[in-house]
């Protein structure tokens, strides 16, 4: 019999009560109307009055009672709980027990409130068994509350008989009751009394219910369709029936009535045709549905965050698509109607799907929909990894919550990816209440904080099924309730769904229960099939699909209903043929009965076939798993969930099917466009879980947070990420979580009483306590450092690793206890199996035999636990997984996969923990275990087993066990014989060639007695196969002690295909112990390949530790010397101070009163410039008229000195100061007149090489070398040669040359002094403490495993915090490694400023107009933005004006922060209170990787800390990798020993001396070497220079002699010297190399390629290949730009660099080639860095071309010389050879000379007159007068309006063109000399002889080539320069005439090297 709410229903009483609550509007309580279930009158009244259930809640007036207040204690009680109350009160003595418990709780000695204590204690009672409970209660309550503990233990069974919420209420009520036994009437009276008491209380005024515009529901309140949005519980929907049968109980919830939903019926559907082009393209149907139409205005036309709660199947995915299209639209430019230009690289969309299967479906759907826009959609899950390139190329990434958490929580995070996210879509957001909900909370909180900190827009969209408390979720997602919160009830479902919930009798899991479920499921299945429906039956294991199908067929046969399920004969026949070849017997068999199966274990083809058959109606019943519901869009008329017990391997047992799965499965019932009018969803469960699913489906429970249980791990993740650095930030972070929202709404659930929330509404103190407790836990586990004084957090390696690999803190605790550096494989496997991740792996009796079998068959390592423990079971399963043993039990197989999946992650974490702790053996074991799990192969197995080889071959290899070394030596035939299979030989040979192998070469360089530098070169030796090796291979490089116990150094090495043929170099420092170990071992191990390991032992047998004799000059307590000690009032007037500082006082006598050489080592900022000036004053006094040379290592330093001394010295003494650098080429007369020459090492080296012909070099009396410690750098050899050469010059000229070396403190000062010829009283080596402003130094370490960019990103927040701590209102200087980093650092600091109360805290400009004035002057956009926040930028990529503005504002303290590259430390004297060195590495193009900065650079940067006269102390903070901390700590304090690097580049320097005649034989070369620093250090540190065998004086000399031999051989190979025994003769090519300061290797490569008739393209290639361009930087990301430039260039890289010249796109010579072409084509360069790079390329190009012209002339290649001269003209003017030379003039556009039919070579060699035709030439224009030139300008510009300034400039340039009157020759001196001269026609030519080269970055002087030739034979060439004679400008030169050509008639050409001017004439020589 079926009636609505029958009296025998267990729910009837509460339903009755609920109805009365809903209908009581005035609450005038009548005792007769409140009754218990045995009062039939009231029940009948309820049954008749259905309208009462639909009555809306009215707003109560102030004088009426509020039911919520009256029944405060009962408001959250469900039906079952109230029934439990009644049952409990019927129990004898229950009240007395509860009363006593309540009394003892109130009297308990504890700091907790009674409410919290009661709940906490009861949770223990419910959670633990009696044995555990006693210990837990005593630990918690203590012995002082022993009575309470005893009472709880005694009555535990009674207490847990009722739900915990009921027990809490019973105890509270019992405290005030007296009777020990209550009748039913007593209970009723007590309820009424509570109501009466509540009635008399003063009530708060009722609040008005707010109506929200987008909440669409049938009822406002009173039913579940109206939703319990405030977290209340309501009854079932109207029309619900409940029926009871013998086998089951059934509740049917009718489908929603769409007819009464006005919003659904009358919503105007938006037509797709009315929408824009984007929507028309994506949506192929005519209209949007109701929900989509209502959501469209907000989803598509705003950027509001949104929450869309709607039934499954209502079209939420397309709503998500609308928001995606909106995002795409924002990054698109529409050109015309259908042309759309999308900025693909500027945005990312993240779609977070709950399951991988759903992610795959979304990817498939979105890919098709967005294909017209070329939008890439890819899956990023545990199964589908993406490479960095794929991530960059993808716009829409579909991922899972856990995967996106992993991506965003890593500090090495794909920061570019995260920063580009503009839309985050979270599907199934109702998962918040499940275990995975905490992950969603973490993601949203992290995203919201990122939005706030970065001030960037990330839109968040939440998609959900209907939620009970959706407003809370909306608040959590940051949704505006009035705009973005959408709720649609079940009536909006396109196909209404009838839900049938069946509770089958019998104990859950019992046989009876299973049989009842099978029977009931069949009955429902049969019923639906009879209606003509197709049905999906969902089961919960793959095996169960077939089992259920067979069971249904069996029941159908027994009921004679087989024909009911029979498939349609036509469809059956159609698919029978397809199934004939199918191997799945089960599938074929059950198909005959109209059944199908579908699960993830089937082949994809079989799954696709099943789906197609179901769609076509060939099968009526499909038995499937839940993956079908999530992953495939395959609807059915009816879905049946058969059973709700799902095996969870994480918990090691069966759990309830999640509500999200139920909703998703039900969502497949009755999809639009398929089958019946309504859908049907049937759930078959056990009777005890029926109420649970009823409450879930009808949303009777609000969604609560699960975040609290994961707080410790999530806090660690945020600390490791760097987003939370202190307690306050952590409290703020918690405020973004859903837990915070619910804690305030429902505090009792979270252990918070109402009193606490009343006193602290924002729960600040509660959150603080939670954070502090969690932080203490992390601190105790050594995962973070928690300073409880400052409340700051510091991440540690263990915490970072735990965060990156998702380790639980409980597991970390276990590992801390069990990790052992000597652990074996068995120990490690036992430890892994004890992880808390495997606590849920429970032992079940039925699997004992299977486990025993697995233990016997597959366990290779001893198991430390019993098989019946979680640890023992996990261990066996893991070893079985590695051994690839088959597991038959499905639950055990699931457990095995779970264990293996998690073990990989845990092992990787443990490996990194071992590496970070420097445990060699442990790390090796862990890496082997990692690879074993990943490859499913034991580490001791043969490496070839990793390849896909036949079983018999594998078996043979395992039997013979040949080593890989042996196999690699065999040929294919021999390999075939080895495995007894000749055919397999070639395959094995191919496989072996692809097995990764790395060759290692190592060199050692002792630095000090305790530190050694190791240089290793790694050479890959295998064939790359993308199918095997993918895009990259990962290796670990370890340096271990000989016993492998201790790791001395480690690095991760990434090898990609393009680098396969390169040698990879690494440099690192290791400590040396005492006594010295016999050897260290360099080991390179593959990260993935088993057995792939290379080792190289470095023996210390012949190692000699260096002898670094030094001294530290102690600062004597002298009275400061007054400036009057100079005894020269003129000089004294220069100085603004009265006294020298202590360091200057100590050095004064030696420098000012003697002519002794001196070395002064002192920290930066200690006043060394004054020391140099003291030496200068002495030189002025002692050697008047002599020159002083000041050598600074950088042009910026030179400029600083020039500016300073020109202001300081020249006006006072009259002595001129001249700059001599590559940028400044002064007139020779200026150099001659100057007293002080300030230059760079390279420039002075080039000049002094020809000292015999340069008098000013011979006149030098003092050389000051600043920063001489740079000897150790690449430029150090130049300084060595200068010193050696000047000493040599001094010995030759007998004129003394004083040397002054200035440096920071060095640790081998005696060697430095000895080399400089310094005596004891001239040696000063002061410690860092002599600084006028004392320096505080901090060195902070960061994770070693981070790549460069993520590492820099990680440092930004610590930089910001350091500025706030150390320099909150004083200047701070931040040094970074690259120009790009200045920009990225500035942007991050701006984001962090945005989170401050005062975002402009670093800006000290109050006047907005003043700020705008500065901003208007700035060109760079980033600088313009950053200046508004008080942050300046300074690097070479900025234009000079931008740099000057930054410099000026920082100097004036208008801005507080300046971010600069390291060059600023050298070039600009700009001190600050705080200096932060952000990273100690920079990118080096030579090694295509990052290398450490020189210590000298770091010291120089640190030297900028502390402002004299402003600061009492300065602060310097160095951020580096953790492994480098000790290195910098040692050497930054002690000083670094300086070594020579001359031996690496001796070739060119020795060549220069050979050219000058200083060296004519090998003995002289050796003698010259004895003057060098190299000679001295080779004796004191022989091992560093490769001297191992014989380290005696004779042995060192022999080594240096062999060094000279090899150097001379190199020069000979370059055709630069001729060797005759010991004599050395320089060739002209060596003279050319030395004169133009280019490498002999450049000459060598040119001589290999040069020929006559070279093309323009060939010359351009030769120029690009010059060795001088080796160091042109190629930065990350420039390869793509180079490829694009190559495609757009005249000469592509592919067509130019062919055969032996083939070069990759990342080669600096290729970049040079492309930049030169871009310069000639005058095209815009893609990035600012390329502009500066082009300047560098052009700077070198002319010097190299001059050398090339001389080489070609020497070889007599006439045509090649002409081409090279043309190349020089083109480079200077920035045009191509066929462009009109006239068109380079001001105001004209480049134009080609048309209508020529000559070849390229012919065109280059044509004279201007030949080219002329109808065009004017430069020579003609140069002869015109002023008016004519104005007419010519109008003619050339076609009358287009140009500014007057441009016209004037055109005229001015034309009037100064170096047009000549002609060529004249005279012969003299016995006809041996031919004199040529000509003169300028223009009298307006400037005296500087500058020529117009507008596109060249430096000023160019007039220069002519005079070429004499006969036909194609080049006979003579001479460079001619103009000079002023009287009022005329004359070009004059003398040519030597060889005897053999006298009397010949020669053709002479005079060609300008910059302009298209050429003069030709024929002259016959006199015989």
From Swiss-Prot:
Keyword Signal: no
Catalytic activity, as annotated: ATP + H2O = ADP + phosphate + H(+)
Principal localisation: cytoplasm
Residue positions of motif DEAH box: 1266-1269
EC code: 3.6.4.13
Motif (DEVH box): 427-430
Domain of life of the source: Eukaryota
One function term, GO molecular function aspect: helicase activity
Pfam families with a match to the protein in the record: DEAD (PF00270), Helicase_C (PF00271), Sec63 (PF02889), SNRNP200_wHTH (PF23445)
Annotated compartments: Cytoplasm, Cytosol
Enzyme class: hydrolase
Keyword terms, alphabetized: Antiviral defense, ATP-binding, Cytoplasm, Helicase, Hydrolase, Nucleotide-binding, Repeat
GO BP field: cytoplasmic translation; defense response to virus; regulation of translation; rescue of stalled ribosome; ribosome disassembly; ribosome-associated ubiquitin-dependent protein catabolic process
InterPro entries, sorted: AAA+_ATPase (IPR003593), C2_domain_sf (IPR035892), DEAD/DEAH_box_helicase_dom (IPR011545), Hel308_SKI2-like (IPR050474), Helicase_ATP-bd (IPR014001), Helicase_C-like (IPR001650), P-loop_NTPase (IPR027417), Sec63-dom (IPR004179)
Note: Present with 486 molecules/cell in log phase SD medium.
PANTHER family: ACTIVATING SIGNAL COINTEGRATOR 1 COMPLEX SUBUNIT 3, DNA POLYMERASE THETA, PUTATIVE (AFU_ORTHOLOGUE AFUA_1G05260)-RELATED
Subunit structure: Component of the RQT (ribosome quality control trigger) complex, composed of SLH1, CUE3, and RQT4. Interacts with CUE3. Interacts with RQT4. Interacts with HEL2. Associates with translating ribosomes.
Homology family: Belongs to the helicase family. SKI2 subfamily.
Record function comment: Involved in activation of the ribosome quality control (RQC) pathway, a pathway that degrades nascent peptide chains during problematic translation. Drives the splitting of stalled ribosomes that are polyubiquitinated in a HEL2-dependent manner, as part of the ribosome quality control trigger (RQT) complex. Also represses the translation of non-poly(A) mRNAs together with SKI2. May block translation by inhibiting translation initiation factor 5B (FUN12) action on mRNAs lacking a 3' poly(A) structure.
Name of the protein in question: RQC trigger complex helicase SLH1
Organism: Saccharomyces cerevisiae (strain ATCC 204508 / S288c) (Baker's yeast)
Name of the encoding gene: SLH1
């Amino acid at each position: 019999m079926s009636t609505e709410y029958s009296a025998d229903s267990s729910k009837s009483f509460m339903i009755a009560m609920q109805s009365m609550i809903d209908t009581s509007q005035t609450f005038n309580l009548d005792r007769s109307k409140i009754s218990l279930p045995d009062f039939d009158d009231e029940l009948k009244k309820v049954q008749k009055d259905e309208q009462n259930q639909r009555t809306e809640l009215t707003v109560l007036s102030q004088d009426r009672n509020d039911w919520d207040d009256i029944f405060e204690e009962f408001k959250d009680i469900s039906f079952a709980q109230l029934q439990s109350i009644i049952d409990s009160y019927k129990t004898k003595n229950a009240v007395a027990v509860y009363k006593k418990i309540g009394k003892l709780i109130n009297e308990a000695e504890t700091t907790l409130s009674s409410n919290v204590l009661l709940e906490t204690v009861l949770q223990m009672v419910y959670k633990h068994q009696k044995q555990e409970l006693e210990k837990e209660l005593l630990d918690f309550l203590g012995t002082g509350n022993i009575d309470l503990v005893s009472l709880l233990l005694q009555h535990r069974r009674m207490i847990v008989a009722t739900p915990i919420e009921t027990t809490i209420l019973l105890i509270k009520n019992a405290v005030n009751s007296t009777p020990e036994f209550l009748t039913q009437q007593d209970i009723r009276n007590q309820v009424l009394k509570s109501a009466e008491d509540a009635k008399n209380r003063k009530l708060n005024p009722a609040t008005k219910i707010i109506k929200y515009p987008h909440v669409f529901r049938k009822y406002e309140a009173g039913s579940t369709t109206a939703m319990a949005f405030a977290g209340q519980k309501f009854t079932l929907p109207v029309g619900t029936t409940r029926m009871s049968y013998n086998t089951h109980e059934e509740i049917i919830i009718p489908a929603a009535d769409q007819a009464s939903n006005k919003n659904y019926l009358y919503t105007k559907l938006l037509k797709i045709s009315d929408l824009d082009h984007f929507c028309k393209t994506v949506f192929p149907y005519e209209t949007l549905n109701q929900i989509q139409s209502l959501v469209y205005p907000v989803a598509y036309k705003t950027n509001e965050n949104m929450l869309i709660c709607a039934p499954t199947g209502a079209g939420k995915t397309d709503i998500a698509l609308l928001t995606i299209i909106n995002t795409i639209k924002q990054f698109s430019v529409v050109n015309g109607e259908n042309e759309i230009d999308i900025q693909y690289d500027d945005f990312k969309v993240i779609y977070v799907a709950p399951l991988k299967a759903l992610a795959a479906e979304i990817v498939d759907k979105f890919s098709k929909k967005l294909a017209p826009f070329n939008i890439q959609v890819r899956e990023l899950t545990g199964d589908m990894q993406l490479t960095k390139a794929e991530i960059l190329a993808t716009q829409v990434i579909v991922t899972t919550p856990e995967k996106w958490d992993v991506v965003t929580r890593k500090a090495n995070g794909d920061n570019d990816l995260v920063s580009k996210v503009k839309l985050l879509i979270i599907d199934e957001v109702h998962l918040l209440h499940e275990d995975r909900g905490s992950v969603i909370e973490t993601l949203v909180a992290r995203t919201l904080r990122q939005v706030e900190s970065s001030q960037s827009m990330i839109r968040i969209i939440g998609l959900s099924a209907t939620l009970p408390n959706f407003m809370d979720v909306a608040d959590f997602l940051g949704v505006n309730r009035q705009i973005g919160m959408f709720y649609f009830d079940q009536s909006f479902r396109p196909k209404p769904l009838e839900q049938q919930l069946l509770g089958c009798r019998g104990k859950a899991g019992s046989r009876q229960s299973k049989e009842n479920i099978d029977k009931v499921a069949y009955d429902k299945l049969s019923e639906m099939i009879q209606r003509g429906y197709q049905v999906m039956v969902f089961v919960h294991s793959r095996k169960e699909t077939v089992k259920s199908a067979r069971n249904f067929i069996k029941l159908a046969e027994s009921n004679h209903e087989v024909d009911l399920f029979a498939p349609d004969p036509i469809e059956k026949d159609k698919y029978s043929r397809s199934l004939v070849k199918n191997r799945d017997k089960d599938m074929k068999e059950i198909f005959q009965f109209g059944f199908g199966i579908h699960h993830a274990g089937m082949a994809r083809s079989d799954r696709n076939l099943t789906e197609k058959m179901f769609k076509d109606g060939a099968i009526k019943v499909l038995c499937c798993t839940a993956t079908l519901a999530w992953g495939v869009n395959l609807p059915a008329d009816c879905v049946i969930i058969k059973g709700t017990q799902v095996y969870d391997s994480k918990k090691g047992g069966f759990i309830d099917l999640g509500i999200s799965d139920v909703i998703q499965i039900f969502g497949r019932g009755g999809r639009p466009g398929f089958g019946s009018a309504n859908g049907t969803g049937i759930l078959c469960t056990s009777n005890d879980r029926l109420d649970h699913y009823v409450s879930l489906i009808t949303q009777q429970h609000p969604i609560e947070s699960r975040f609290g249980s994961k707080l410790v791990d999530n806090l660690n993740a945020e600390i490791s990420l760097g987003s939370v650095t202190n307690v306050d930030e952590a409290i703020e972070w918690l405020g973004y979580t859903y837990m915070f929202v619910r804690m305030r709404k429902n505090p009792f659930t979270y252990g918070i009483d109402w009193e606490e929330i009343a006193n602290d509404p924002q729960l600040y103190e509660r959150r603080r306590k939670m954070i502090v407790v969690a932080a203490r836990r992390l601190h105790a586990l050594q995962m973070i450092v928690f300073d409880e004084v400052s409340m700051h957090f510091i991440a540690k390696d263990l915490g970072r690793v735990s965060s990156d690999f998702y380790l639980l803190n409980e597991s970390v605790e276990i590992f801390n206890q069990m990790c052992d550096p000597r652990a074996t494989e068995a120990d490690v496997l036992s430890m892994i199996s004890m992880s808390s991740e495997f606590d849920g792996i429970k032992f079940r009796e039925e699997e004992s035999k299977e486990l025993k079998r697995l233990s016997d068959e597959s366990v290779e390592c001893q198991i430390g636990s019993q098989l019946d423990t979680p640890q023992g079971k996990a261990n066996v399963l893991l070893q079985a997984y590695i051994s690839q043993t088959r597991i038959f039990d499905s639950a055990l197989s699931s457990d095995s996969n779970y264990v293996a999946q998690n073990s990989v992650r845990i092992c990787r974490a443990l490996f990194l923990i071992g590496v970070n702790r420097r445990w060699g053996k442990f790390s090796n074991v862990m890496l082997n275990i990692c690879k074993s799990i990943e490859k499913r192969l034991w580490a001791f197995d043969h490496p070839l087993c990793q390849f896909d080889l036949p079983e018999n071959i594998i078996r043979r290899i395992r039997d013979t066990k040949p080593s890989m070394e042996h196999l690699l030596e065999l040929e294919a035939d021999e390999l075939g014989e080895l495995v007894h299979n000749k055919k397999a030989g070639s395959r094995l040979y191919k496989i072996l060639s692809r097995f990764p192998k790395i060759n290692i070469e190592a060199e050692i360089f002792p630095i000090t007695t305790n530190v050694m530098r190791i240089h290793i070169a790694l050479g890959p030796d295998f064939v790359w196969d993308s199918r095997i090796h993918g895009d990259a291979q990962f290796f670990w490089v370890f340096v271990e002690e000989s016993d492998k116990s201790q790791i001395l150094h480690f690095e991760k090495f990434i090898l990609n295909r393009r680098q396969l043929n390169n040698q990879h170099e690494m440099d690192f420092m290791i400590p040396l112990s005492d006594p010295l170990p016999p050897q260290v071992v360099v080991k390179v191990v593959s990260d993935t390949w088993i057995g792939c390991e290379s080792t190289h032992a470095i023996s210390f047998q012949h190692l000699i530790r260096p002898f670094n004799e030094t001294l530290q000059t102690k600062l004597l307590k002298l009275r400061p010397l007054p400036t009057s000690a100079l005894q020269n009032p003129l000089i004294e007037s220069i100085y603004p101070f009265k006294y020298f500082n202590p360091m200057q006082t100590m050095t004064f006598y030696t420098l000012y009163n003697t002519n002794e050489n001196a070395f002064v080592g002192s920290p930066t900022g200690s006043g060394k410039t004054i020391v140099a000036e003291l030496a200068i004053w002495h030189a002025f006094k002692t050697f008047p008229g002599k020159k002083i040379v000041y050598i600074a290592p950088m042009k910026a330093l030179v400029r600083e000195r020039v500016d300073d001394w020109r202001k300081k010295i020249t006006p006072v003494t009259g002595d001129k100061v001249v700059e001599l650098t590559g940028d400044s080429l002064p007139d020779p007369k200026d150099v001659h007149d100057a007293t002080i020459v300030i230059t760079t090492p390279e420039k002075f080296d080039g000049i002094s090489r020809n000292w015999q012909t340069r008098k000013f070099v011979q006149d030098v009396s003092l050389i000051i070398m600043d920063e001489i410690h740079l000897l150790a750098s690449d430029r150090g050899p130049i300084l060595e040669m200068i010193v050696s050469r000047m000493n040599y010059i001094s010995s030759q000229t007998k004129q003394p040359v004083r040397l002054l070396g200035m440096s920071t403190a060095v640790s081998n000062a005696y060697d430095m002094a000895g080399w400089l010829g310094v005596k004891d009283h001239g040696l000063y080596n002061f410690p860092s403490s002599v600084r006028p402003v004392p320096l505080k130094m901090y060195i902070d370490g960061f994770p070693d495993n981070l790549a460069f960019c993520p590492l820099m990103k990680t440092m930004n927040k610590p930089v910001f915090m350091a500025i706030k701590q150390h320099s909150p209102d004083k200047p701070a200087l931040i040094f970074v490694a690259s120009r790009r980093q200045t920009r990225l650092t500035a942007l991050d600091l701006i984001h962090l400023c945005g989170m401050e109360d005062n975002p402009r805290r670093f800006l000290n400009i109050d006047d907005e107009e003043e700020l705008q004035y500065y901003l208007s002057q700035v060109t760079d956009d980033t600088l313009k933005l950053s200046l508004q926040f008080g942050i300046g930028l300074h690097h070479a990529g900025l234009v000079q004006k931008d740099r000057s503005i930054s410099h000026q504002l920082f100097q004036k303290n208008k801005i507080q922060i300046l971010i600069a590259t390291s060059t600023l430390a050298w070039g600009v004297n700009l001190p600050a209170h705080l200096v932060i060195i952000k990273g100690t590495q920079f990118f080096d193009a030579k090694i295509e990787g990052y290398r450490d900065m020189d210590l000298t650079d770091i010291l120089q940067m640190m030297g900028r800390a502390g402002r004299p006269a402003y600061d009492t102390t300065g602060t310097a903070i160095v951020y580096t990798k953790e492994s480098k901390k000790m290195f910098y700590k040692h050497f930054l304090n002690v000083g670094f020993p300086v070594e020579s690097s001359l031996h690496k580049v001796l070739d060119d320097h020795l060549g220069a001396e050979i050219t000058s005649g200083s060296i004519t034989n090998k003995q002289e070369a050796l003698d010259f070497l004895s003057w060098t620093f190299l000679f001295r250090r080779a004796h004191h540190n022989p091992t560093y220079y490769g001297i191992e065998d014989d380290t005696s004086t004779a042995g060192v000399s022999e080594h240096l002699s062999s060094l000279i031999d090899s150097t001379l051989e190199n020069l000979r190979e370059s055709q630069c010297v001729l060797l005759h025994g010991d004599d050395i003769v320089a060739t002209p090519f060596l003279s050319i190399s030395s004169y133009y300061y280019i490498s002999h290797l450049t000459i060598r490569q040119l001589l290999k390629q040069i020929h006559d008739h070279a093309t323009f393209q060939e010359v351009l290639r030769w120029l690009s290949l010059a060795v001088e361009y080796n160091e042109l930087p190629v930065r990350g990301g420039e390869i793509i730009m180079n490829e694009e430039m190559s495609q757009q260039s005249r000469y592509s890289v592919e067509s130019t660099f062919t055969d032996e010249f083939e070069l990759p796109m990342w080669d600096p010579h290729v970049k040079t080639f492309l930049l030169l072409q871009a310069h000639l084509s005058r095209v815009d360069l893609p990035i600012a860095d390329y502009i500066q790079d082009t300047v560098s390329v052009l700077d070198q190009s002319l010097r190299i071309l001059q050398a090339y012209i001389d080489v070609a002339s020497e070889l007599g290649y006439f045509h090649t010389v002409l081409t090279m001269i043309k190349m020089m003209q083109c480079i200077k003017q920035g045009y191509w050879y066929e462009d009109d030379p006239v068109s380079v003039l001001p105001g004209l556009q480049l134009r080609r000379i048309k209508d020529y039919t000559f070849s390229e070579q012919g065109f280059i060699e044509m004279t201007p007159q030949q080219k002329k035709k109808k065009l004017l030439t430069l020579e003609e224009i140069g002869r015109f007068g002023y008016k004519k030139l104005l007419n010519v300008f109008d003619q050339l510009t076609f009358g287009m309006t140009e500014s007057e300034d441009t016209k004037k400039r055109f005229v001015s340039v034309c009037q100064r063109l170096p047009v000549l009157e002609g060529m004249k020759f005279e012969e003299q001196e016995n006809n041996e000399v031919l004199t040529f001269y000509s003169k300028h026609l223009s009298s307006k030519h400037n005296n500087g002889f500058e020529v117009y080269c507008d596109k060249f970055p430096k000023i160019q002087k007039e220069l002519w080539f005079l070429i004499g030739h006969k036909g194609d034979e080049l006979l003579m060439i001479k460079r001619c320069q103009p000079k002023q004679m009287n009022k005329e400008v004359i070009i004059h030169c003398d040519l030597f005439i060889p005897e053999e050509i006298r009397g010949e008639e020669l053709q002479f050409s005079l060609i300008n090297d910059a302009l298209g001017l050429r003069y030709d004439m024929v002259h016959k020589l006199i015989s």
